[in-house]
């Protein structure tokens, strides 16, 4: 059975989006598939390309042939280079400007800021707890003094 990795078209007439699928080469474009391994939204800016790298590597390894369009997507994500053993396996996939957290440095800074905020919160909570315990001790000792005074 000849297996292809190709695009399955979904969406409206002028607003297409695609699923990256593994299918028998003899089936229809939007027909029965063996497995869906990703999605591609070309109308967004930048285009959304989400391919399960592990599954793509598996299907390429067992002999599935990508179409020209899917081959271009695999090159962008770096899966084709990884499969062929070529340099550049990290790919050239762009991310939105708002997704700055995707960079490792920004993510580390964000985690450090959250941890610092958590430490401040813990410190305030422990100070409140200590103050409450101290006031309870004072109230308890005052009550004990009153009890001793009333016994006499």
From Swiss-Prot:
UniProt-annotated stretches for the region Disordered: 118-152
Domain of life: Bacteria
GO biological process, one term: translation
One GO CC term on file: small ribosomal subunit
TM region positions: none
GO molecular function: structural constituent of ribosome
UniProt keyword terms in alphabetical order: Ribonucleoprotein, Ribosomal protein
Biased composition (Basic and acidic residues): 118-130
Low complexity bias (residue ranges): 131-144
One Pfam family from the record: Ribosomal_S16
Family: Belongs to the bacterial ribosomal protein bS16 family.
NCBIfam families, sorted: PRK14520.1 (NF011093), S16 (TIGR00002)
PANTHER family registered for this protein in UniProt: 30S RIBOSOMAL PROTEIN S16, SMALL RIBOSOMAL SUBUNIT PROTEIN BS16M
This protein's name: Small ribosomal subunit protein bS16
Record gene name: rpsP
